[in-house]
């Protein structure tokens, strides 16, 4: 069957659902996927630096964060993107909580974060977040156990960063700072295809050596980490509101 034949073929998905299933299983993600329903388009002000690819790599941090800063934190069993634990440093109410800012009756956008008791144990991380100068929401350290490429791909997702974010306020994006040194591990990024799933033709990798910094629009890009090391990988993930302050920080941190 040629591509022209496919274009003109009748829609038999309702009469023969097993044919639709055969098409779906050709993608490595199960469908329907919750990420596919997260909005891509909105009127929120966004960063020019992310317009083209949805991410920007920044220069490496000159003075890496000491391991005593992140090993002493209180971690919670919370799964996202693999076998993970998270240490909340800033949350909606300052409590140790890995959930979003959407508690029933107290829904709010992922901004105006309040530091938790973990922040007292990592003063350099706290200073780093504050030095960006932009409004931050969730701030946390992720601990990720090793996972190979195929395992990682099955955990790809997009983030619902802008739920409850007023459309006239800055689009929320996320920054990464690698705390451990795993240069053979990488962040895997893909754009969404017309079927609402990650498009392998757009796959990009960002290496995860110690001190690596980058900013991602994780509501736009499907993402996950392939961690090939033999020890846990730690990284700082921070939500920031797009706007002049974040733009100035990006300009300062470009290579």
Task: Indicate where each model-derived feature is located.
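Histidine (H) residue identity feature
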Residues: 27, 33, 44, 155-157, ...
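Structured loops at beta-to-helix junctions and adjacent beta-edge loops in soluble globular domains
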Residues: 61, 89-92, 144, 180, ...
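Non-heme Fe(II)/2-oxoglutarate
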Residues: 2-140
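Intrinsic-disorder/low-complexity, polar/charged segments enriched in Ser/Thr/Lys/Arg/Asp/Glu/Gln
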Residues: 56-57, 172-174, 235
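Polar low-complexity intrinsically disordered regions
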Residues: 1-15, 187, 194-197, 255
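Catalytic core of Fe(II)/2-oxoglutarate
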Residues: 188-255
């Amino acid at each position: 069957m040629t591509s022209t034949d496919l274009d003109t073929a009748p829609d038999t998905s309702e009469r023969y659902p097993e044919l639709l299933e055969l098409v779906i299983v050709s993608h490595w993600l199960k469908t329907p996927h919750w990420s596919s329903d997260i909005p891509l388009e909105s009127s929120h002000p966004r960063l020019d630096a992310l317009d083209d690819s949805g991410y920007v790599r920044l220069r490496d941090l000159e003075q890496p964060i000491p391991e005593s800063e992140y090993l002493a934190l209180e971690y919670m069993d919370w799964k996202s993107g693999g076998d993970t634990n998270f240490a909340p440093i800033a949350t909606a109410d300052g409590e140790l909580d890995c959930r979003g800012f959407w508690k029933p009756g107290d829904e709010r956008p992922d901004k105006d974060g309040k530091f938790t008791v973990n922040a007292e144990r990592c003063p350099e991380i706290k200073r780093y977040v504050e030095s960006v100068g932009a409004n931050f929401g969730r701030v946390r350290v992720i601990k990720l156990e090793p996972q190979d490429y195929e395992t990682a791909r099955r955990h790809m997702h997009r983030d619902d960063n802008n739920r409850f974010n007023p459309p006239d306020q800055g689009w929320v994006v996320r920054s990464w700072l690698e705390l451990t040194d795993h240069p053979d591990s990488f962040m895997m990024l893909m754009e969404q295809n017309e079927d609402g799933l990650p498009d392998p033709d757009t796959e990009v990798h960002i290496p995860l050596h110690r001190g690596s910094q980058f900013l991602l629009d994780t509501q736009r890009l499907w993402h996950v980490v392939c961690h090939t090391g033999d020890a846990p990988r730690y990284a700082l993930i921070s939500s920031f509101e797009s706007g002049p302050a974040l733009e100035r920080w990006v300009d300062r941190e470009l290579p």
